[in-house]
Amino acid sequence: MNLVPTVIEQSSRGERAYDIYSRLLKDRIIMLSGPIEDEMANSIVAQLLFLDAQDSTKDIYLYINSPGGVVTSGMAIYDTMNFIKADVQTIVIGMAASMASVLVSSGAKGKRFGLPHSQVLIHQPSGGAQGQQTEIEIAATEILKTRKMLNGILAKNSGQPIEKIQADTERDHYLTAQEAVDYGLLDGVMENNSKLK
């Protein structure tokens, strides 16, 4: 059961009811929560493009609580974050795992935050293949290319050497918010929203 709260606002013209996500969008807040897949990515991309077109001089706030998901869907969000002019502030609430860790680390420099009890998980991409031997080889080659690409992004975003990223993503590597700051994936731990600019 998916319940989306409704917010009622008063104006001189009467009352207006919004779903909570539409109301947050008015304040340039986008919620990325749950597994990253095509439908969610399309919604996030559309919101980023809309807010950038509305005013590219104002920051966009992307709150992330996600176990990760489909790499190509995540890369659509990543590319859009870099494509638009507006700075995207990223804030981890809960968990930013796998592809979500790439996204949270890709926020505007100096504007990547985590709440005190949030976590970041980095690891290598996973996938599966079946079929003929040549199809399995093609899939294996592709996942190695994907891993190299994601490790490169994490290295660029964190300032860590690629060799450290490769070693740390060999297995699940959990980081508290403060550890993610020390690692270079985040810029600060937020106790309250006073750090948001």
UniProtKB/Swiss-Prot annotation:
<dbReference type="InterPro" id="IPR029045">
    <property type="entry name" value="ClpP/crotonase-like_dom_sf"/>
</dbReference>
<dbReference type="InterPro" id="IPR018215">
    <property type="entry name" value="ClpP_Ser_AS"/>
</dbReference>
<keyword id="KW-0645">Protease</keyword>
<dbReference type="InterPro" id="IPR001907">
    <property type="entry name" value="ClpP"/>
</dbReference>
<dbReference type="InterPro" id="IPR033135">
    <property type="entry name" value="ClpP_His_AS"/>
</dbReference>
<comment type="similarity">
    <text>Belongs to the peptidase S14 family.</text>
</comment>
<keyword id="KW-0720">Serine protease</keyword>
<dbReference type="GO" id="GO:0004176">
    <property type="term" value="F:ATP-dependent peptidase activity"/>
</dbReference>
<comment type="function">
    <text>Cleaves peptides in various proteins in a process that requires ATP hydrolysis. Has a chymotrypsin-like activity. Plays a major role in the degradation of misfolded proteins.</text>
</comment>
<protein>
    <recommendedName>
        <fullName>ATP-dependent Clp protease proteolytic subunit</fullName>
        <ecNumber>3.4.21.92</ecNumber>
    </recommendedName>
</protein>
<keyword id="KW-0963">Cytoplasm</keyword>
<dbReference type="GO" id="GO:0009368">
    <property type="term" value="C:endopeptidase Clp complex"/>
</dbReference>
<feature type="active site">
    <location>
        <position position="123"/>
    </location>
</feature>
<dbReference type="Pfam" id="PF00574">
    <property type="entry name" value="CLP_protease"/>
</dbReference>
<dbReference type="GO" id="GO:0005737">
    <property type="term" value="C:cytoplasm"/>
</dbReference>
<keyword id="KW-0378">Hydrolase</keyword>
<dbReference type="InterPro" id="IPR023562">
    <property type="entry name" value="ClpP/TepA"/>
</dbReference>
<dbReference type="GO" id="GO:0004252">
    <property type="term" value="F:serine-type endopeptidase activity"/>
</dbReference>
<dbReference type="GO" id="GO:0051117">
    <property type="term" value="F:ATPase binding"/>
</dbReference>
<dbReference type="GO" id="GO:0006515">
    <property type="term" value="P:protein quality control for misfolded or incompletely synthesized proteins"/>
</dbReference>
<comment type="subunit">
    <text>Fourteen ClpP subunits assemble into 2 heptameric rings which stack back to back to give a disk-like structure with a central cavity, resembling the structure of eukaryotic proteasomes.</text>
</comment>
<feature type="active site" description="Nucleophile">
    <location>
        <position position="98"/>
    </location>
</feature>
